[in-house]
Amino acid sequence: MKVSVLGPAGSYSEIAAKSLFSVICSRTAPHIFFTSSIENAVLRLFENDENGETANFAVIPVENSIEGAVGVSMDLLLEKDVCIVAELILPISHCLFVSKETAHLSGFSLDQIQTVYSHPQGIFQCRSFISSRLPISETVETDSTSKAAKIVAAINPAEKICAAIASEAAGKEYDLEALHFNIQSIPNNSTRFVLVMRSDSRKMTQKVNGSDFYMLPEYFSQTGSGSVFYKTSLAITPKNDRPGALFQILEAFNNFKINLTRIESRPSKRVLGEYFFFIDFEGNPSDSNCAQALSLVFERSASVKILGTYGRILPDRQ
């Protein structure tokens, strides 16, 4: 099983990928492909690497409890021919690391740290700690938190004293010294990751108004041990030639007592003021109420893209 994630090793995306497969497909350990960006992780589903290999799956972050939606991921779900097959909510715990050489310097203290490296979200999520404990340090953004850890591991403290904000896994991967744990400003920090694959690789199980809905691959349900319930994700463009268009779409879910778990807007990038709406709801199209609600949604929308019907791994099984 080949899975592409944002790297390098020790990233939260890698942690999410391993956690997902340990629950939904415990007999198959994934082979992780590390990429330099979220976009490249998805492109690996379609493009060969230097060894002529493509990935079967990609794991990407779509939403953080502090920062909200991950825009690049939402755009990729909309633009690429992929579907969601599972999701996982991963608790995010940031740590402050320095190299062991730095930690063992005589008289070393936080005041000596000149530069702090991390992903932009890592920096933002730890802004209170940075402002209070590292007020004179420069912050430098990296492609991922694990990339920050890798950079710090390679810097000679004789040249510059620097630190990284990253996961415990990244600290272990690059043999760094942890100075502080759980430095995020809000303790209940979590990120929603989704497992995606090419739509043409899925086994189609049902059509609604001519659009394909995809269920979990058979080997997930055969080997899985996690407690799951189904969710369905859509990307919708309302009809903009009449008032109350979005209300009428949402009314369809309310009429059939369908619980919505997320509504998120995203610019269409075509015309100012035109938006796609990402909608997640509990259930799958084989349920009578869901099927009837979806029929109305199709009637009342200018366009509907099915992003997937999939299992959500419950927190008590992670």
What feature does the model see in each segment?
Residues M1-Q318:
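Domain-level signature for soluble enzymes in the chorismate/prephenate branch of the shikimate pathway
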